[in-house]
Amino acid sequence: MVNFNQFLKQAQTMQKKMQEAQEQMANTRYTGKAGGGLVEIIATGKGEVEKVSIDASLLKEEEKEMLEDLIKVAFNDAKQKCDADSQNSMSGALSGMSLPPGFKMPF
């Protein structure tokens, strides 16, 4: 059985590592691209869009629907990169913890 004081110390260490990982994620920028770079979105680790870049060739009425699709694809690309990085960061923060068998984390 794990000593309660040891468990508390591990929990404090895990909390500190998770806070550091969250701060690092918040300061990281993710670039999502679509249409071979015709549309780019830069988002923060918090999922906030900072910048949208659209190639001038897409700014025509007949390209409206394609542009809307490319913006969606670029945003989802940036979000997927952020989510993958978040999962890796949180997994790293939890390494070395003695968690009970079957314990699932909320992320």
UniProtKB/Swiss-Prot annotation:
The keyword Cytoplasm applies. InterPro entries: YbaB-like_sf, YbaB/EbfC. Its main location: cytoplasm. The keyword Nucleus does not apply. Signal peptide: none annotated. GO terms for cellular component: bacterial nucleoid; cytosol. Belongs to the YbaB/EbfC family. This is Nucleoid-associated protein RBE_0048. It comes from Rickettsia bellii (strain RML369-C).
